[in-house]
From Swiss-Prot:
Subunit structure: Part of the ribosomal stalk of the 50S ribosomal subunit. Interacts with L10 and the large rRNA to form the base of the stalk. L10 forms an elongated spine to which L12 dimers bind in a sequential fashion forming a multimeric L10(L12)X complex.
Organism domain of life: Bacteria
Function: Forms part of the ribosomal stalk which helps the ribosome interact with GTP-bound translation factors.
GO biological process, alphabetically ordered: translation
Protein name from the UniProt record: Large ribosomal subunit protein uL11
Single GO molecular function: large ribosomal subunit rRNA binding
Keywords for the protein's UniProt record, in alphabetical order: Methylation, Ribonucleoprotein, Ribosomal protein, RNA-binding, rRNA-binding
PANTHER family named among the record's database cross-references: 60S RIBOSOMAL PROTEIN L12, LARGE RIBOSOMAL SUBUNIT PROTEIN UL11M
Annotated gene: rplK
Annotated source species: Mesorhizobium japonicum (strain LMG 29417 / CECT 9101 / MAFF 303099)
Cross-referenced CDD domains: Ribosomal_L11
InterPro entries: Ribosomal_uL11, Ribosomal_uL11_bac-typ, Ribosomal_uL11_C, Ribosomal_uL11_C_sf, Ribosomal_uL11_CS, Ribosomal_uL11_N, Ribosomal_uL11_N_sf
Modification after translation, per record: One or more lysine residues are methylated.
Gene Ontology CC: cytosolic large ribosomal subunit
Length: 142
């Protein structure tokens, strides 16, 4: 018989640096999930990733207090800021440009995010990434 799902929890955790301190510890603890077990498993799986990159993770926890988790790719905004060498996007995206991103970089980001985006092909994924770039005040050139 399959385990009964008690719920799901979505977090964004820095790759390779999951610790029992807030916000991870309290979020997991109040649901009865073993915090150290999650931290060890998450850090082991994110060893190969760039340290400090934000990784969205969906944790499914069961009534017997066990859990499974699925990691997604870092957010598009993270990739765009990295490609444009920015700390943050524009404060006024429609008026003030924060920087530029080449179409090749957009294609690279779209290819990396393809499995997490709701797109059928790379061109559709590129349009989604370009929309994110515009909303951050970045100009797509090339």
């Amino acid at each position: 018989m399959a385990k009964k799902i008690a719920g799901q929890l979505k977090l964004q955790v820095s790759a390779g640096s999951a610790t029992p301190s807030p916000p991870i510890g309290p979020a997991l603890g109040q649901r009865g999930i073993n915090i150290m077990e999650f931290c060890k498993a998450f850090n082991a799986q994110t060893q190969e990733m760039e340290k400090g990159s934000p990784v969205p993770v969906v944790i499914t926890y069961y009534q017997d207090k066990s859990f499974t988790f699925v990691m997604k790719t870092p957010p598009v905004s993270y990739f765009l800021k990295k490609a444009a060498n920015l700390k943050s996007g524009s404060k006024e995206p429609g008026k003030v440009k924060a920087g530029t991103v080449s179409r090749d970089k957009v294609r690279e980001i779209a290819t990396a995010k393809m499995k997490d985006l709701n797109a059928n092909d790379v061109e559709a994924a590129m349009r989604m990434v370009e929309g994110s770039a515009r909303s951050m005040g970045l100009e797509v050139v090339g």
